[in-house]
Amino acid sequence: MAPQNPLLGTWRVESFERWTADGTLTQPLGMPPAGYAVFDDTGHAFVQLGRATTTDLSPKDIAQSLMAYFGPYAIDGDELTVTVEASNMAAYIGSHQVRRFARDGDALTLGVEGQYRAKLRRVTA
């Protein structure tokens, strides 16, 4: 029997934090941010994060905050790798995006230490 997939389902982003070069922690997508990460049972990931439309930003600014990518994913211990098929971020296309993750019930934290951290909550399994 294969081990249960700890990421399977739809996860809503609750916070997105990024560290600046000098080590300052920022919230570039505002609070609360908007978006979801979906990990399906066929082994595909779909990630879309951005600023919430309730902010005082223009529609153009909100659209420019969007980070989206998708592709097949693999899990190895506490490490997630998404092989990016397409993205609105040119540098991601064809890359392997590797993230450490920790899950506590319906709460998920993933990111790259010293770069960024996203906290999400399970919507569906």
State what each model feature region is:
Residues 1-125:
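Lipid interaction determinants
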